[in-house]
């Protein structure tokens, strides 16, 4: 699947490969914006919303091979043969999965805050419960969604991070 992207053109044109920035779980393409701002001087930057995140398509399949294929599909749609990938957390595992699927598409790879191992800890169950509760409710505003999330989560910072992806239907 082709992912939603934000593309930025390098201010100083070099022959460097473009850099694809891949966010972590519950994130969006904005999450690595600080890196994008620093790197765009010398590199074309592509920030992606991974599947089921941000404005990218939704799909019941959510695994690393599928996410790696999405990156290939996105490169194909943009007519990019090879890129440098920087992935954070879930994005890091997705770009590591890309090494098995399409190693020829990778110029360089940076995985941040993740290792290529299985994580058996179910540390996001409360977050999924909060997101599901909002999805199943008739919440139409960020305030309503936040109130529902507070029934499942105690960390206000996590709630505010999750609300970045909430669409206030009054603004549509």
Predicted regions and their residues:
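Alpha/beta-hydrolase active-site loop signature
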Residues: 26, 50-54, 116
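Active-site loop/oxyanion-hole signature of alpha/beta-hydrolase fold enzymes
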Residues: 6-8, 33-40, 46-90, 94
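Alpha/beta-hydrolase fold catalytic core
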Residues: 1-20, 40-43, 80-82, 171
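Conserved alpha/beta-hydrolase catalytic His-Asp/Glu region
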Residues: 122, 137-172
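Active-site glycine-rich loops that stabilize anionic/oxyanionic intermediates
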Residues: 24-27, 89
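Flexible "cap/lid" loop of the alpha/beta hydrolase fold
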Residues: 96-101, 107-145
